Each structure stands twice: as structure tokens, then as C-alpha cells.
């Protein structure tokens, strides 16, 4: 069975057992009345069952309802069908004030019907010939308004300065100021020139997201013809059907696939209603993507540390044990489905490098947009500053130093032999994003 954990807030007077049963029925075989065609099938075989309800400590009107869905309810290899069944209609149920899908347990038999990421972590490292450290990226800013040639120039400066990747922002598609084909051509030129100068393999996340699947595929085909290593997709606004199709194309044609989660906070940010990002992360691993944005913990975007580390493990690891202290409701066995690199991006700069290296580890992508392009000396020095800071943190960690305790000291030491890093540290020494997260663990989940 597929197991689901729902946070249920029923209307006053609706008992938890009745609300849980209603969720199970509405998201499987049930309707609002008895129908004569019920007698034409075996409902016991197909109906969802609420097998447990547990109150949320500290919330008098909330409880967690655990629901089991028989596998025969779902089309093989279709995230679209899975979500249409489990969350498609029940969230508008009048008997509930709020409903949130906290987690899913996907059984191995169903996982095996998905291709998953086009390539996975190890294949990506082998393609790029880069090991033993996080990968470095940068989102080109301003995200909108640049001409294709100026955009390509910014890409080149960042890549030659030491970054592994640059990136289209999520809303860069094919606008009047920069059509997609022109952008692809100038970015490919920048990649090849930077590779020739540095001797390293470089990439730019060319956003293939489009208004139709046909246009999306056309852009991916052109990227392959240019010989670039990676394309990008906005998987929530683009949709799971389009994403899975693109992932299959990328595997067949040797392209890596970067995934942006634009629109996720509309779905996952409120604690009492919607869907937790760990569910969206699991769905992406099944649908297919080699990278996905996962918050930063320390930057400008929402993300509590333990919760973030929980879904980062769900993206990368083969087996993740149940751990309520990190918000993981079920043990998840991925049965060797390739892993996804989490991407830390959003309001981060060189002073965050020790914390990011310690939190996310080697199998991650650290992306500094403003933290590269905002360098007072230009894009290439900004890239140099980030690369020096990363190499210093990785070396210090490998020497046994504590990045959490000695991080600032490690960065200051590196500043002595890198004027680019010293300038970056001076610019961003006062920047903080100290706001309490909205989505936090429940009291009974914390150790």
C-alpha cells in the first residue's frame, strides 16, 4: 500500500475518526451517498483505509490521520495520477477546516515503475569529472531584461571565474527582450569559451520550460544539438506530466536535468493546509530530475534545519528511516532509484559557505546569484571569491576542523591570500536573514 500522513483540522463537532475516514474515502472510492454500482466491484479491495489517528500535541483541534491506499488505485509510473487520487479533490471537503499532506510512503513495487532522475548523483559527477566537494552555481541577475548577448557575457564571466554552473532564473523562458534560441546560442558560446580557458567542464541550466510540451521538447532538442550538458525545468508550474516526459528525453540523450520548484510555497508553506515539501521532493525523485532547489537554512528562504535535512536525505539516500525529529513519518526504501542533488539557493554569500558545506555536504549544489554578481569588482571576481571560500572550507573540513565553530575564522584566513574573497567579505559582512520559519516541527517531534 501507499501510506499517507495527513494533518487534519476538522470542523467543530466532527470527531477525528469520522474526519479521517472521510479523507480516506474521498481520496479513493467514496462519494457522498451509496450508489448501486458499488455492487459491481469489490470495494474492500480498492477503498482507502484510515488505520490510525493521533492528536497533535499543543494543538487541540488537529490530529494526524494515517491512510493506506491499495496499489491498484494508481497508474504505474504516473506521479500525475498518484496526486490526482490522493490530493485531487479531498482538500476542498467542507467537513474539514484545513488539511495537509505531511508525508507519503511509496512502496518498492510502485517505486520500481518509475525511471526517476535521468542520471543521478554519481553519473553526474563522472560526466563533470568533479569529486570531493559541493558544486558551485550562480543564477544570472537581473533575472529579466538582459539581451541574449549581455546575458551570455555574464555567464562567461561567472564560469571563467571558477563556478561549475550558471543558471536561468525560473521565469526566464522566451520573452520579447530575449528569445530562447538566442539565449541558448550565446550561453553555449560562453560555456565553450570558459571550458577552453579553465580546462574544466562547465554548464548553464538552459530553461526549457514552455507553454506547451511540444515547445519544451523543441528547446531540449536544440540544447542537445548545441552539445551543452544540462537543461532546466520548472516542475510545478510546468506540471508532472511534462516533467516526466522531459526527464525521459534527458536520459535518452545524455542531458542532465535541473529542477526549479517555482510555486512550491503556495502549496507547502502553511503548516495546517496544503502539502509538505518532503512530499513534493519524493514526487520529483520519481518523476525525474538530477537537481532540485531545497532551501538553504541560512539564506532568505523558508526552511528549518532539521526539516530541510530530512527531505535532503529523502532526495539523496537509498534508504531513509522513519525519524519524527526530522519530520519523516515513514521509512522510505528507494530500491536503488538514482539520487537527486539538493540545491541551496536564495540569499546566500561567502560568509554562509562554512555552514552550507557543513549542512549539505559534498553531494549538493551551492548557488550564489547576488552573492556572485553583487561583487564590487564584477562577476568573475565574485565567482573567484565563492570558489576560494568553498575550497578553503572543504580543505579545513578534511583536516578535521569544525566548520560550525571555526567557520568565520576559516574564511578570514582565506581572505589573506585572496583579495577577491576579502572584498566580498567586506560587502556582505552585515547581511542577515533572521526570521523565524513558519513551517516548524510539532512539540512531540522534537527531541
UniProtKB/Swiss-Prot annotation:
Gene Ontology BP, a term: photorespiration
Known catalytic reactions: 2 (2R)-3-phosphoglycerate + 2 H(+) = D-ribulose 1,5-bisphosphate + CO2 + H2O; D-ribulose 1,5-bisphosphate + O2 = 2-phosphoglycolate + (2R)-3-phosphoglycerate + 2 H(+)
Annotated site residues (Transition state stabilizer) in this chain: 300
Record: active site: 141, 260
Post-translational modification note: The disulfide bond which can form in the large chain dimeric partners within the hexadecamer appears to be associated with oxidative stress and protein turnover.
Cofactor binding note: Binds 1 Mg(2+) ion per subunit.
Localization terms from the record: Plastid, Chloroplast
GO molecular function, one term: magnesium ion binding
Residues annotated for Mg(2+) binding in this entry: 167, 169-170
GO cellular component: chloroplast
Enzyme Commission code: 4.1.1.39
Modified residues (N6-carboxylysine): 167
Listed cofactors: Mg(2+)
The keyword Metal-binding is assigned to this record: yes
Key words, A-Z: Calvin cycle, Carbon dioxide fixation, Chloroplast, Disulfide bond, Lyase, Magnesium, Metal-binding, Monooxygenase, Oxidoreductase, Photorespiration, Photosynthesis, Plastid
Pfam family, one: RuBisCO_large_N
Annotated positions binding substrate: 89, 139, 143, 261, 293, 345
Complex formation: Heterohexadecamer of 8 large chains and 8 small chains; disulfide-linked. The disulfide link is formed within the large subunit homodimers.
PANTHER family linked to this entry: RIBULOSE BISPHOSPHATE CARBOXYLASE, RIBULOSE BISPHOSPHATE CARBOXYLASE LARGE CHAIN
Function in brief: RuBisCO catalyzes two reactions: the carboxylation of D-ribulose 1,5-bisphosphate, the primary event in carbon dioxide fixation, as well as the oxidative fragmentation of the pentose substrate in the photorespiration process. Both reactions occur simultaneously and in competition at the same active site.
Similarity-based family: Belongs to the RuBisCO large chain family. Type I subfamily.
Record's miscellaneous remark: The basic functional RuBisCO is composed of a large chain homodimer in a 'head-to-tail' conformation. In form I RuBisCO this homodimer is arranged in a barrel-like tetramer with the small subunits forming a tetrameric 'cap' on each end of the 'barrel'.
Protein name as annotated: Ribulose bisphosphate carboxylase large chain
Name of the encoding gene: rbcL
Amino acid at each position: 500500500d501507499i501510506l499517507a500522513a495527513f494533518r487534519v483540522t476538522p470542523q467543530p463537532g466532527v470527531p477525528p475518526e469520522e474526519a479521517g475516514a472521510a479523507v480516506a474515502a474521498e481520496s479513493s472510492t467514496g462519494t457522498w451517498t451509496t450508489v448501486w454500482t458499488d455492487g459491481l466491484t469489490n470495494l474492500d479491495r480498492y477503498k482507502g483505509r484510515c488505520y490510525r489517528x493521533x492528536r497533535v500535541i499543543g494543538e487541540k483541534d488537529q490530529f494526524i490521520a494515517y491512510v493506506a491506499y491499495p496499489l491498484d488505485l494508481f497508474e504505474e509510473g504516473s506521479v500525475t495520477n498518484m496526486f490526482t487520487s490522493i490530493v485531487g479533490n479531498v482538500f476542498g471537503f467542507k467537513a474539514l477546516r484545513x488539511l495537509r499532506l505531511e508525508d507519503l510512503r511509496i512502496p518498492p513495487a510502485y517505486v520500481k515503475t518509475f525511471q526517476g532522475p535521468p542520471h543521478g548523483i554519481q553519473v553526474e559527477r563522472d560526466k563533470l569529472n568533479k569529486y570531493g566537494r559541493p558544486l558551485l552555481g550562480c543564477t544570472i541577475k537581473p533575472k529579466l531584461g538582459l539581451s541574449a548577448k549581455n546575458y551570455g557575457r555574464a555567464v562567461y564571466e561567472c564560469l571563467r571565474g571558477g563556478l561549475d554552473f550558471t543558471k536561468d532564473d525560473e521565469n526566464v523562458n522566451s520573452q520579447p527582450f530575449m528569445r530562447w534560441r538566442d539565449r541558448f546560442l550565446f550561453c553555449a558560446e560562453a560555456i565553450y569559451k570558459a571550458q577552453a580557458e579553465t580546462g574544466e567542464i562547465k554548464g548553464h541550466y538552459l530553461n526549457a520550460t514552455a507553454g506547451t510540451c511540444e515547445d519544451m521538447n523543441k528547446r531540449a532538442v536544440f540544447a542537445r544539438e548545441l552539445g551543452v550538458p544540462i537543461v532546466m525545468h520548472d516542475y510545478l508550474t510546468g506540471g508532472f506530466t511534462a516533467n516526466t516526459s522531459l526527464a525521459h528525453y534527458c536520459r535518452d540523450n545524455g542531458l542532465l536535468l535541473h529542477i526549479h520548484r517555482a510555486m512550491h510555497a503556495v502549496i507547502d508553506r502553511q503548516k495546517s493546509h496544503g502539502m509538505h515539501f518532503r512530499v513534493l521532493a519524493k514526487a520529483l525523485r520519481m518523476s525525474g530530475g538530477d537537481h532540485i532547489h531545497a532551501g538553504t537554512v541560512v539564506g532568505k528562504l523558508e526552511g528549518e534545519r532539521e526539516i530541510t535535512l530530512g527531505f535532503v536525505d529523502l532526495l539523496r539516500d537509498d534508504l531513509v528511516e522513519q525519524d519524527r525529529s526530522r519530520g519523516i513519518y515513514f521509512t522510505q526504501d528507494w530500491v536503488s532509484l538514482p539520487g537527486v542533488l539538493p540545491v541551496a539557493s536564495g540569499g546566500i554569500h561567502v560568509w554562509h559557505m562554512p555552514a552550507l558545506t557543513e549542512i549539505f555536504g559534498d553531494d549538493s549544489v551551492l548557488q550564489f546569484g547576488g552573492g556572485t554578481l553583487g561583487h564590487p569588482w564584477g562577476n568573475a571576481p565574485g565567482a573567484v571569491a565563492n570558489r576560494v571560500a568553498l575550497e578553503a572550507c572543504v580543505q579545513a573540513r578534511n583536516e578535521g576542523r569544525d566548520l560550525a565553530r571555526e567557520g568565520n575564522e576559516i574564511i578570514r584566513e582565506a581572505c589573506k591570500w585572496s583579495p577577491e574573497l576579502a572584498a566580498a567579505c567586506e560587502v556582505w559582512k552585515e547581511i542577515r536573514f533572521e526570521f523565524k520559519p513558519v513551517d516548524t516541527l510539532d512539540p512531540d517531534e522534537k527531541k
